[in-house]
Amino acid sequence: MTNLSSDEKLKKATGVVCKQGLFPFPVSETAIRIVKHVVAEEAELDMICAFKDVPSQTMDQLKESSGFSEETIEKLTTSLAKTGLIFNQPSSTGVMVYRLLPLVMIGLMEYKFMTKLTGSNEERELAELFEKLLMELRDEVQSNYTALEPLFASAPQADRTVPARQTDDGKNINIIKVD
């Protein structure tokens, strides 16, 4: 991907991310802004694009699909795992498997906001982008519901989360409003 501009790489990588998960969706300006918000360097975009054809890969597969060295793959996947874009976990046989996650529905959004939040401008901006993306996806689903109905019928049941006001040790949870 060396002959692509940074913006073209960003759009291509966002397209790969948008194809992940149970419900792939089209690339939007909002999705591009979210990926731009969390990706630290251009090489991470190249790593994301290595998952274009196969969303879960071993180190050997990633070496082939990305063209990166093992050391570079370790560095990039660790960085992307910290942002919530890659899930890296050993398989039952002990082989490390790297999986590209979607933006939403158990992906970047959930991992990004599962940790302790500071209320920083960066967190607020990202939360606003995710809120906008969810509204766009809602509108997309509503306008194409009949075509998407078979996907919903075959999808596993969604987990339900009941928000708590206190932690297990009795401390109040600070809820940061986006308004």
What are the language-model segments listed below?
Residues D53-S66:
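Short acidic, hydrophobic short linear motifs in intrinsically disordered regions
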Residues S66-K82:
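Short amphipathic alpha-helical interaction segments
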Residues M1-R33:
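Long, low-complexity, charged/polar intrinsically disordered regions in eukaryotic proteins
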Residues I48-C49:
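Hydrophobic residues on short alpha-helical segments
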Residues T93-R138:
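Short, amphipathic alpha-helical interaction segments positioned at domain boundaries
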Residues A81-S92:
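A short, conserved structural fragment
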Residues A127-D179:
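Long, Pro/Ser/Thr-rich low-complexity/intrinsically disordered regulatory tracts in eukaryotic proteins
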